[in-house]
Structure formats: structure tokens, C-alpha cells
Regions:
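N-terminal binding-site loop/beta-alpha segment at the start of enzyme catalytic domains
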Residues: 1-86, 122
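N-terminal small/glycine-rich loop or linker at the start of catalytic domains
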Residues: 7-26, 85-99, 128, 132-141
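Alpha-helix N-cap and loop-to-helix initiation/capping positions
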Residues: 27, 31, 60-64, 68, ...
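Short, acidic/polar
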Residues: 27-39, 104-118, 183-187
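Short beta-strand segments at enzyme active-site cores
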Residues: 46-50, 83-87, 123-129, 174-177, ...
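Active-site gating/metal-coordination segments in enzymes
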Residues: 94-128, 204
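Beta/alpha (TIM)-barrel catalytic core signal, keyed to glycine-rich beta->alpha loops juxtaposed to Asp/Glu
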Residues: 132-334
Length: 344
């Protein structure tokens, strides 16, 4: 396994991060336990979850993933072996705390304490803001509509997080689904007012969505706030299993087709087919090629992988052993030029 510093913290995290969002929906607790056991045995010391999980998010499964992880900690007594990341949900989920989903006051206090209780731990290594309080364009949405009173409480949020860092409930903090403008506002306040510094940005990044490179890559490198990429396989498209419009029974697209609209774009299958041809030409597993491409980016701290089977998990973790030649990278970049970011 490979390791990198999380931002400018003292934490060395594996460059493969264990994703968990299927646990409690597509995966049973028993299957999740098997994944955690295996991932740790392979040196994956960085695990990511969220209060909102399992996914697709529903009131009935809210918090289930954290509870499964907490049960594993209780049974195995290996909390100290894991760098644990979770996320507090932003606005738009009315069933969470009666819709009071700001990142300050009682809402944050309740969210944090509830996560700690479900996870059966007294601290979280990386506490992330799942998405901004303000309206932002994501998942390829165009036509930004500015609302004068739509604002993020940057300084108040950092002061609130500082309280829980000082209490020992949080070690470090991070962002998710954030924009360059939002990231820089947080960093400026941290520098100017000696407030907690954001250590990471958890945003989508894959062969089908390299939009992170446009603005956030520079921020990550210059400011030492690395990317934690989610959806490196574009919810399975870059494994090749959805080629020719086929959705295998039990797969994410077959189960929750209406939820994953971000991948149903005109050039998705065309780009996937070209990447598939590259993997076959150079005798590479398509999933491993896709994950390794993400891991090798200078701005990348860790690639979050998810799996519904042990076979998938083993394949994805073994991507750290793969080498991508200059020829492979060149051909990948050529596909990007023909089909630029089909699933932003």
C-alpha cells in the first residue's frame, strides 16, 4: 500500500480509501465486516463514511452505515488502526433534524454527537462538510443563479469546528463537493484568524469527470489540501460492466437507475468504450487502470473505492500495484480530448 500525508496534518493515510456508502443498502453488515477485515489486512487504514449513508439516501437507512462501522469497532477493538472520516449533511434533507441542517449551533453539535454514538468512538479523525450551505453548481449543472442572501457562514463554521477540535471530538476537518471560491474562503480565514485549516476536498474525479483539474487542482497543490476522489469508477461505468447498455442484475444502475442520472449522458458509453479498448490493448484491468490514473495525480491524496463484492474490493485495492506507461497515459488523454468530461 502507498501512503500520503492528509493535507499538512500528521496523518499518513493510504492512497486507497475504503468507501462505505453501500453498507446497509446493497451490502449486509456481515459483508461490510468482511470488507473492513480485508481492507485493513491490505494496509487500507483510511475509511470514509457519512451520517447520510447508506446511498441512495432514505430516511429508513439514515445512519445505518455508521452503525455498521461502529459495531465492527466494538467487536474488533481496532479503532486505533483506522483513520476515520465521516461527513455532516448540509441542507436539503428535511428528515434530518427537522431540516435544520446548518453547520453551526445545536445542529452541528447534534450531528457530531449522533455520529460519534453510532460509530461507537469518542473522536473522528476527519470531519467533513458534505456539501456547501449555499447554492452551488455541481454534477455538470450550468447556469449559476446567484442569490444575494445565499451565503456560507465560513467564519462561524470554523469557530464551531474549533470548539470540537479543542474538546478532542474532532482531529481534523475537511470539505466535500466544494468550489475553488469556497475552499479559498475557508483557507483565508484559517490563515488570517488562526482557525482550523481544512485538510482535504472530497469531490468527484474519474476518467469520465476530470473537471477537478480546471480550478481545484491548483488549489490542492499550492495550498496542500489534497483531493479525496469519490466515484473513481463512475458508479461502475469504468469497470466495464455497463458496456453496450447492459445493467447486470443487482448492480447499482439496475437497482437505482433513476438516482444516477449524472452518468446517463450522450457521450458516456462512447468514452467508456474507448477506455475499455485501451485497457485491453495494454492488458490492464479496466477498473485498476481507472483507479490508478486517479491515484497518480499530483493533487490526489486518496482515491475512495467502493465495492459490493469481495472480488471487486480485491481488484480495486490491487490497483496500487499497477503501472501506467506513458503510452497508456497518452491514449487516455486523447480520449479526454475527443469526449471531454462526459459525466461532470
Amino acid at each position: 500500500m502507498n501512503y500520503k500525508k492528509l493535507g499538512n496534518s500528521d496523518l499518513d493515510v493510504s492512497t486507497i480509501c475504503l468507501g462505505t456508502m453501500t453498507w446497509g443498502e446493497q451490502n449486509t453488515p456481515k459483508e461490510a465486516f468482511q470488507q473492513m477485515d480485508f481492507a485493513l489486512s491490505e494496509g487500507v487504514n483510511f475509511w470514509d463514511t457519512a451520517e447520510l449513508y447508506a446511498v441512495p439516501p432514505r430516511k429508513e437507512t439514515y445512519g445505518h452505515t455508521e452503525m455498521i462501522i461502529g459495531d465492527w469497532f466494538e467487536r474488533n477493538k481496532k479503532r486505533d488502526k483506522i483513520i476515520l472520516a465521516t461527513k455532516v449533511a448540509g441542507p436539503a434533507r428535511d428528515y434530518l433534524r427537522n431540516g435544520e441542517n446548518s453547520f453551526v449551533g445545536k445542529n452541528l453539535e447534534n450531528a457530531l454527537n449522533d455520529s460519534l454514538k453510532r460509530l461507537k468512538t469518542d473522536y473522528i479523525d476527519l470531519y467533513q462538510l458534505h456539501w456547501p450551505e449555499r447554492n452551488v453548481n455541481n454534477f455538470g449543472r450550468l447556469g449559476y443563479v446567484h442569490k444575494e442572501n445565499d451565503w456560507s457562514q465560513f467564519e462561524d463554521v470554523l469557530n464551531e469546528l474549533k470548539k470540537y477540535i479543542e474538546k478532542g471530538k474532532i482531529r481534523y476537518v475537511g470539505l466535500s463537493n466544494e468550489t475553488p471560491w469556497g475552499v479559498m474562503n475557508y483557507l483565508k480565514l484559517s490563515n488570517d484568524k488562526s482557525l482550523p485549516r481544512m485538510m482535504s476536498i472530497q469531490n468527484p474525479y474519474s476518467l469520465l469527470n476530470r473537471s477537478y483539474e480546471v480550478g481545484l487542482a491548483e488549489v490542492s497543490i499550492r495550498e496542500e489540501i489534497g483531493c479525496l476522489s469519490y466515484s473513481p469508477l463512475a458508479s461502475g461505468y469504468l469497470s466495464g460492466k455497463y458496456r453496450n447498455g447492459k445493467f447486470p442484475k443487482g448492480s447499482r444502475m439496475e437497482r437505482d437507475f433513476d438516482f444516477w442520472t449524472r452518468y446517463r449522458k450522450p457521450n458516456t458509453e462512447k468514452a467508456v468504450e474507448e477506455y475499455y479498448k485501451i485497457s485491453k490493448k495494454y492488458d490492464l484491468d479496466m477498473s485498476q487502470m481507472s483507479i490508478k490514473f486517479c491515484e497518480e495525480q499530483e493533487f490526489m491524496t486518496s482515491v475512495i473505492i467502493g465495492a459490493t463484492t469481495m472480488e471487486q474490493l480485491k481488484t480495486n485495492i490491487e490497483s496500487v500495484k499497477v503501472k501506467l506507461s506513458e503510452e497508456v497515459i497518452k491514449e487516455i488523454n486523447n480520449v479526454q480530448k475527443i469526449y471531454p468530461n462526459p459525466c461532470p
